[in-house]
Amino acid sequence: MRTFLLAVFTLLNVVAIQAQSLNLETDNGVKYNDPQVPASIGIVLYSNDVETVFNALRFANYSQEWDNQVQIFLLGKGVELEGLVKTNEDIKKQVDTFVGQGGVIMGCQTCFQSRKKDGSQICKVACIQDLYDLVKKNQIVLTF
């Protein structure tokens, strides 16, 4: 009986801890998971697949509509975005909307160099430190 009560007590403590973790608050009392509070979102885009790129940009634009700050870092094949913009009108519209709303797009300098390119018209050439900063400073980081 004593073991059973100890197990129940332990389980109740675990449930209480998990319930508290769902309502974590910052120092100023704002809940982390509060959908009414804007977040900072970093997106690492490392694909040149049209559907994946389109959905990443669509998500970025949707997030901006909810007053979230969004940054995109192009990595690997992601730096080929400019070519997709030239050949796909839907992606061009998404990029234009994102940049027009103040969104920031950065592209990996090394990835451009490996493709014998100096950079892109649609993004700032960036380095590994910029990618590190994006991951470190944003509350949410997604990869596509």
Indicate residue ranges for each PLM-predicted region.
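Short N-terminal segments immediately surrounding and downstream of signal-peptide cleavage
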Residues: 21-45
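Bacterial Sec-dependent N-terminal signal peptides
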Residues: 1-25
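Short, glycine-rich nucleotide/cofactor-binding loops
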Residues: 36-54, 79-86
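A glycine-rich helix N-cap at a beta->alpha junction
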Residues: 88-117
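Mature extracytoplasmic domains of secretory-pathway proteins
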Residues: 66-91
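A short aromatic-anchored loop/beta-hairpin motif
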Residues: 101, 106, 120-142
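Histidine-anchored nucleotide/phosphate-binding helix
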Residues: 53-68
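Short internal beta-strands
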Residues: 60, 70-76, 106-109
